[in-house]
Amino acid sequence: MAGRVQLPRLLLLVMLFFPPHLWPQRSRAAKPDSDTITELVRRVVANYKSREAQLDNYTYLAHVARTEFDGNGKPKGKITGTDEIMILEGTPYGRTVLLNGRPLSPEQERQQQMLLEAEASARRAGYNNHPVHNFFLAPIVQLPDEFRLRWRSRQLLRGHEVQIIEALPIDEQRPASSDQEYARHFKMTLWIDADEAQIVRVESEVISSVTLDQNLFEVSPDVKFSGVHTWRFEYARGTTTAMEWTKVNDEAWLPKWSSWKTPKETVTALTPTKPAVPIHSPEQLTATYSDYKKFRVDTHVVPK
């Protein structure tokens, strides 16, 4: 009898703290409908595009580690380096300050200074094609229109609630632009801070092989000048990329870390001075970013 008396009291307490008119709202909050998801993704992509230029307003350190694997997937070599990203003649420039955890040798320091001076001269002459930012494969801009979006769950990430959304390419047999065709090679998972309407993390995976032409920084053998050459990269199915961002100074969303891993990579040089030789090398590239400082001083190199 005591149990029968307590049950109505328990139900009364439930009704008091969780009244029925709140039940539908709680249900909807637990799993947004497809229109709500699409609108949220459209907003965060717009914010993502607008925030990309913010990185050029900061100096920072980029800590990079490159690991190669053998045919059995075991690591066979690792190289690490730290670059100081500064503002040189008005635009970002990366200067290596550590190699494999150690300061540069006097000769390496001399080479870095020569490269900086050569780059400064080139920029003063109007040439500026020095890639600094980490290349990120994920087709984020195409998310609202070229992917089927599925809400998965909520979780806490660094103390903030984020919504996890899965993005699968739309499977349609129709003519496609180059951007649409590119998007069809990926599936992605998003971590979204809905309160800020910002993408906090993205993980992507290549689901069908994709080939890209990319500009890469190169140095002349005598270290007299730097330049950019076009290489062709084939990213195999199973290649994964990820990036996470954090809010800096309560004003800018900037990269916190990034990673890239491929089971197989085919690289073909397209420069006229090098043969087109494929290179197969499974590898992983990880980077963390730290010491962000709002740009204050531009570096100028006085010509000798």
Predicted regions and their residues:
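Short, flexible coil/linker elements and helix-boundary hinge sites characteristic
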Residues: 5-6, 18-19, 126
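Bacterial N-terminal signal peptides that target proteins for export
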Residues: 1-11
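Structured extracytoplasmic
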Residues: 25-187, 194-201, 205-241, 246-304
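Bacterial N-terminal signal peptides
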Residues: 9-21
